């Protein structure tokens, strides 16, 4: 089953780097929360998110973990849809999954930058394939995620 999560980045730190036309827009904020029911009624155990964050560090390091402007219908991102690249991802002691991304100069990245410049609150979403088990507090994402 394709699991899609979307969180509005409530407290986003916007960082403009560089000068003139060479500026880069970076966003930092809370991407997800461990062990709490999210907006879609799912709970991601910390152990699962820790293993996923660890598994994608190489992609983050070589700048190949790109994201799209809109939700793709499946778990694949096509480079023609890219709007940002994830540049950092970690889990705090309180279980907050904190992330950083750089907005790309692609057409979709330019749309994201325009939305941010116009004061629109944007969200961040994650996708993955896995199963869930019905729990007392919500649907718990299983180890096959």
Which positions does each model-derived feature cover?
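Polar/acidic, low-complexity leader/linker segments enriched in S/T/G and N/D
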Residues: 1-60
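Short beta-strand and beta-hairpin "edge-sheet" elements
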Residues: 3-13, 74-98, 139-145
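A structural detector for beta-sheet-dominated domains
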Residues: 15, 28-32, 68-70, 80, ...
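Low-complexity, polar-biased intrinsically disordered regions enriched in Pro/Ser/Thr/Gly
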Residues: 15-18, 43, 77-79, 112-114, ...
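A residue-level signal for beta-strand positions that form part of recognition/binding surfaces
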Residues: 24-28, 64-66, 96, 123
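Short loop/turn segments at secondary-structure transitions that flank enzyme active sites
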Residues: 33-37, 73, 105, 130-132
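Short conserved beta-strand and strand-loop elements enriched in small hydrophobics
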Residues: 61-77, 124
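Residue microenvironments linked to proteolytic maturation
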Residues: 87-145
């Amino acid at each position: 089953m394709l699991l899609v999560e979307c969180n509005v980045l409530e407290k986003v730190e916007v960082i403009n780097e560089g000068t003139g036309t060479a500026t880069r827009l970076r966003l930092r904020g809370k991407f997800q929360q461990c062990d709490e029911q999210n907006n879609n009624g799912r709970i991601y155990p910390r152990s699962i998110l820790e293993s996923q964050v660890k598994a994608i560090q190489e992609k983050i390091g070589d700048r190949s973990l790109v994201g799209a402007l809109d939700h793709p219908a499946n778990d694949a991102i096509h480079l023609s849809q890219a709007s940002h690249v994830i540049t950092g991802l970690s889990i705090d002691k309180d279980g907050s999954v904190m992330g950083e991304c750089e907005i790309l100069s692609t057409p979709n990245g330019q749309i994201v930058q325009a939305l941010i410049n116009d004061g629109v609150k944007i969200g961040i979403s994650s996708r993955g394939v896995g199963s869930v088990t019905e729990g007392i507090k919500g649907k718990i994402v299983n180890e096959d995620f």
